[in-house]
UniProtKB/Swiss-Prot annotation:
GO molecular-function term, one example from the UniProt record: helicase activity
Main location as per UniProt: cytoplasm
Entry keywords, A to Z: ATP-binding, Cytoplasm, DNA damage, DNA excision, DNA repair, Excision nuclease, Helicase, Hydrolase, Nucleotide-binding, SOS response
Protein name: UvrABC system protein B
Ranges that cross the membrane: none
Subunit structure as annotated in this protein's UniProt entry: Forms a heterotetramer with UvrA during the search for lesions. Interacts with UvrC in an incision complex.
Domain Helicase C-terminal as annotated: residue spans: 426-588
Biological process (GO), any one: SOS response
Function: The UvrABC repair system catalyzes the recognition and processing of DNA lesions. A damage recognition complex composed of 2 UvrA and 2 UvrB subunits scans DNA for abnormalities. Upon binding of the UvrA(2)B(2) complex to a putative damaged site, the DNA wraps around one UvrB monomer. DNA wrap is dependent on ATP binding by UvrB and probably causes local melting of the DNA helix, facilitating insertion of UvrB beta-hairpin between the DNA strands. Then UvrB probes one DNA strand for the presence of a lesion.
Subcellular location: Cytoplasm
Pfam family, one: ResIII
Gene: uvrB
Length: 656
């Protein structure tokens, strides 16, 4: 079923890791952990496990950037199978919120990326129709999705000779999210001209042309979307929905009645509590939604009523991507030391935000049930899972029935030397080391503890003739990609940052990592974090780590000891098999991301003191995204209003 394509065979620790993980799955182990050092080929090991077991797989990553990186690698390994990408379709998302202390209601505000919507639909269709599928997803995949049974029921099955009118098919297409258009230019559209119906599904590159003879299907074929020439004639075809959330007429009517019943109960509760204003507000808002649902089958914020459409009881878990898979889906949780805490926290953050909306009459209590899975619910839905990390967390060690180490790198690369240097004259020493790196055509990463320090250090490096970039620690997928491009291309020699220099940065050009304030104990200087930072330079033959500190903390010592242990294992392997280490040569695969994300490039150098309005607008947008991600809704709303005002000014200036 799966056909793995690669120019190389498993080597080093990979063969034993693959064998043990496969055997563990066959024995029925629910939880296993793969401890794979940077550059040991963890993705290749995962691909081999999938290929050997021939089971559909879900690979969950902690963020969009890592997910896109994994997606590109799996596409390379499985060119003849379906590899799909499933992440949040929002480029920007500010959720609905209410701030009671200021009586401030903030409406939901979002920018939807149509390309990502279509990729999600492609993933759902593949999972429901075939077994040879790998879906690479972010942790947002545990958020509520549509009912898979509705997704199956609402498709359109056509065959030659079937008695059905073209107008009936067109009406059904509209019900499952397709838009009627005079031109078939984007996915999710259809066109009806006479007896010819043309459809451009969201989940495939070819269009579908259906010719009718009266009210009978006469011919079905796929066609090229560019030159419109026929590709393949078919006897039958199934057309799947263009949107995730589809429902039947019966379910819609049932949901409307169920919402009315909940509204009556909630209004009684609020009035008994003396909350007359809240009751009036809730009645007005909900009745307006019900009118739209009855007339159009849709209303803004319809996701808040998902429990009524699904027929779930209060508190029952929502449908998610996991429910679309067969029961034997194999799940990998990449960078699990980050992903596990994320999965634990997502439900709490969502519940906290909705609490004030429900209490103050903006939403019915059923809004609580439009949510991500709790961590416990996630584990119940997953039949078997493999945690993957260079530094697994306590949970992984606690539950795993088998822990597999993958220390040896096929390239022979050895973990970098770690050197502790005093903080006195640390900046001068650092500049000297960076200049040595630059002379070799390599790059440097510097990690500090505060944004202010990062900015000042970056500016000083520029003054000293080093092309340096200062980056915020909270970057969205697009912004991080731009940084990766500039650093890997050599547009800059060094990047100074905070938390961003940890997991997932695949930068073989980097040969120096400097860790300032290494002895300041805390989350950013824990053993796990230090090992992750050290790993950023493990893909380069000249890899070196400088820890600037006045004392060696227990976390530093454990990180250094673990690094030295891994160095020893790799050096013994290299000597035994006569391997000469070589720096990893890896082409820029940024175009994978650019296919999905459409945003103007943003310059993060931020050294210009006099900003143009366009530059100021970019900075405001960046700050707005960050405020929303940190649940600072009031700040995000103020920034949004300022952005709208500035955009209007720019429109007026361009007009003049």
């Amino acid at each position: 079923m799966f056909k793995l394509v690669s120019d190389y065979e498993p080597t080093g620790d990979q063969p034993q890791a693959i064998d043990r993980l496969v055997e563990g799955i066959k024995k029925g182990y629910r939880f296993q952990t793969l401890i794979g050092v940077t550059g040991s080929g963890k993705t290749f090991t995962m691909a081999n496990v999938i290929s050997r077991l021939n089971r559909p797989a879900l690979v969950i990553s902690p963020n969009k950037t890592l997910a896109a990186q994994l997606y590109g690698e799996f596409k390379t390994f499985f060119p003849h199978n379906r590899v799909e990408y499933f992440i949040s379709y929002y480029d920007y998302y500010q959720p609905e919120a209410y701030v009671p202390t200021k009586d401030l209601y903030i409406e939901k505000n979002a920018d939807i990326n149509d390309v990502l919507v279509r990729m999600r639909m492609s993933a759902l269709k593949s999972v429901r129709t075939r077994r040879d599928v790998v879906v690479v997803a972010s942790v947002s995949s545990i958020y509520a999705s549509g009912d898979p049974s509705d997704f199956d029921r609402m498709n359109i099955q056509l065959s030659t000779g079937l008695k059905i009118s073209p107008h009936a098919v067109a009406q059904h297409l509209a019900k499952i999210g397709y838009e009627r258009s005079n031109e078939i230019t984007v996915k999710g559209c259809f066109r009806l001209r006479g007896d010819v119906l043309e459809i451009y599904p969201t989940y495939q590159d070819e269009g579908i042309r259906i010719e009718f003879f009266g009210s009978v299907v006469d011919r079905i074929e796929t066609f090229d979307k560019l030159n419109r020439s026929p590709l393949e004639e078919l006897q039958k075809i199934i057309i799947y929905p263009a949107i995730e959330f589809v429902t039947t007429e019966e379910k819609l009517k049932r949901a409307v009645e169920s919402i009315k019943n909940e509204l009556d109960q909630r209004l009684t509760e609020l009035k008994n509590q003396g909350k007359i204003l809240e009751a009036q507000r809730l009645q007005q808002r909900t009745m307006h939604d019900l009118e739209l649902l009855s007339a159009l089958g849709y209303c803004p914020g319809i996701e808040n009523y998902s429990r009524h459409f699904d027929g779930r009881k209060p508190g029952e878990p929502p449908y998610t991507l996991l429910d679309y898979f067969d029961d034997d889906v194999l799940v990998f949780l990449d960078e699990s030391h980050i992903a596990v805490p994320q999965l634990r926290a997502m439900w709490r953050g969502e519940h906290s935000r909705k609490k004030s909306l429900v209490e103050y009459g903006f939403r019915l209590p059923s809004a609580f049930d439009n949510r991500p899975l709790t961590f416990e619910e996630f584990l119940k839905k997953v039949p078997q899972i493999i945690f993957v990390s260079a530094t697994p967390g306590p949970f992984e060690y606690q539950v795993s029935e088998q822990i597999v180490e993958q220390i040896i790198r096929p390239t022979g690369l050895i973990d970098p030397e770690v050197e502790v240097r005093p903080t006195k004259y640390q900046v001068d020493d650092l500049i000297s080391e960076i200049k040595k790196v630059v002379e070799r055509g390599e790059r440097a990463l510097i990690t500090v503890l505060t944004k202010k320090t990062a900015e000042k250090l970056s500016e000083y490096l520029v003054e000293m003739g080093i092309k340096s970039l200062y980056i915020h620690s909270e970057l969205d997928a697009i912004e991080r990609i731009e940084v990766l491009k500039k650093l890997r291309r050599g547009d800059v020699d060094a990047v100074v940052g905070i938390n961003l220099l940890r997991e997932g940065l695949d930068l073989p050009e980097v040969s120096l990592v400097a860790i300032l304030d290494s002895d300041k104990e805390g989350f950013l200087r824990s053993e796990t974090t230090l090992i992750q930072i050290i790993g950023r330079v493990a893909r380069n033959l000249n890899g070196k780590v400088l820890m600037y500190a006045d004392r060696v903390t227990p976390a530093m010592q454990r990180a250094i000891d673990e690094t030295n242990r891994r160095r020893k294992i790799q050096m013994e392997y290299n000597e035994k098999y006569g391997i000469t280490p070589k720096t990893i040569v890896k082409p820029l695969q940024i175009e994978i991301f650019e296919k999905f994300m459409e945003k103007p490039e943003i310059d993060y150098h931020q050294l210009a003191k006099d900003l143009s309005k366009e530059e100021y607008l970019s900075l405001l947008e960046e700050e707005m995204y960050r405020a929303a991600s940190e649940l600072r809704y009031e700040d995000a709303a103020k920034l949004r209003d300022e952005i709208f005002r500035l955009r209007e000014e720019l429109k007026d200036e361009n007009y003049l």
